[in-house]
Amino acid sequence: MRRTGKQTVSCILGGVVLAPLVGIAAPTDSSDELDSIIVVGQKENQGIQRAPEAITALPTEVLKQNVVRSAEDLDGLVPSLVIGESDGYNFDLSIRGIGLNSPQDDGSPASVSVHQNGIFMPNPLALSLSFLDVDHIEVLRGPQGTVFGQNAVGGTLNIITVQPTFDAVKGYSDVELGSFDLTHLRTAVNLPLSSTFAIRLAGDFIKQDGYVSATQVPGDYHLNDTHNYHVRMTALFQPIENFSVVGSLEYAKVVQHEPESKNILDPNTNPYDETSDWPGVYDIDQTIATLTATYDFSAMTFKSLSSVQYMNQGGSNSESGLTVPIATNLYGGENDQFVLHQNYAVTQEFDLSSKPGGPTC
C-alpha cells in the first residue's frame, strides 16, 4: 500500500451546512452519552450497542481520518480483518483467519462475503474499486451464513452508501493532491426533484504516476500507476410513507500498469528501476444496476433486493520482472501471465423481518 504526502481542499455545495450523517448522532451536552451508530447487520436498522453480534462499524469520519479510499486501506483498521493482495490488483479478505483459499483464482467465491447496501457482490474483484460516497462500513465476524448466505463463513463486509433525501440540495467536493502527481477528486450532490422523488450523483476520480520505471520498455514507462474513475447515480421514489423504491446505476474503471516486483537478481540495484521489457497493464470495467423495494407493514418489513452485475478484466504481467534475455539465461525462459476474466451475475433476495415487539419465527 503506497503512502504519499497529500493536501486536501474541501467545499460544500448548495450553500448549506450538511446535516449529521445517518448513524452519527449530533453532539450532545452530556459527556456520558455515546454517539449512536445505526447498523443493518441483521437486515434491519438498529443501534450498534443493541446488535447481538460481533460487528465493527466505521463511520465516514473514521474513513476520512484514516484515508480509506478502498478495501486495501482497511487492513489494520478493523480487529481480526486482514486484506491480502494478489498480483497487485486483487484484494482478498479474511476474518479470524478464514478467507479466500486460492487468491490466484479471481472468480472463485471467498469465505468472507462482500455486500453493498445489503446486495451480494459475487466477484472478489469488486474489492479493487474505490469506496464511493460511503456513509459507513460494517464488518461482521462470522459465521454469518444464516443472514448473508453460504459465502459468509468467515464473516461479511457490508458497504453502506449515502442515500438520496428529500430535505435539500446539498453535496460536497474534495480535491486531494500528493506526490507522484496524485490528483484525487471526490464529489457528490443530492437533488430532491419533488416531494416523492430524489436523486444523488457521486463520482470518484484518481490519477497518480507510478514510482518505478520499467527501463527496457520504450518511452517513459512507469509501473504501479493509477488511472481510475467510479461514478454512481441513485434514485429514490417514495409515493407513500411506508413504501419506497431505490434504484442505482454505477460504473467503475480501473487501469494500471503492472505492479512493481523487483527481482533480487535484477542487475540494476536502483530500487526505483526495474529491468523489465514487458509493458504489462491491468484493465477492469464494472457495471452494477440495483433495485431495492421496501414495504413497511405494521409489524413486519418486506424488502426485495435485485441486481445485475457485469465485470470484465484483462491484462498481463511479467512474472520475472526482467528482460527476456536475462530471464532466459537465469530460468530458461520468460513467464508472462495473461488474464482475461468476465463475470456476469444476477442476484435476487427477499427479506421479511419483524419489527421490535412484532412476531418472530
Model segments located where?
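Flexible, surface-exposed loop regions and adjacent strand-edge segments
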Residues: 217-222, 252, 261-271, 309, ...
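Transmembrane beta-barrel architecture of outer-membrane proteins
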Residues: 66, 90, 111, 154, ...
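Structural signature of outer-membrane beta-barrel domains
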Residues: 44, 89, 178-180, 206-210, ...
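Transmembrane beta-barrel wall of Gram-negative outer-membrane proteins
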Residues: 170-172, 177-208, 212-257, 287, ...
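Flexible loop and strand-edge segments within Gram-negative outer membrane beta-barrel domains
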Residues: 244, 248-286, 337-341
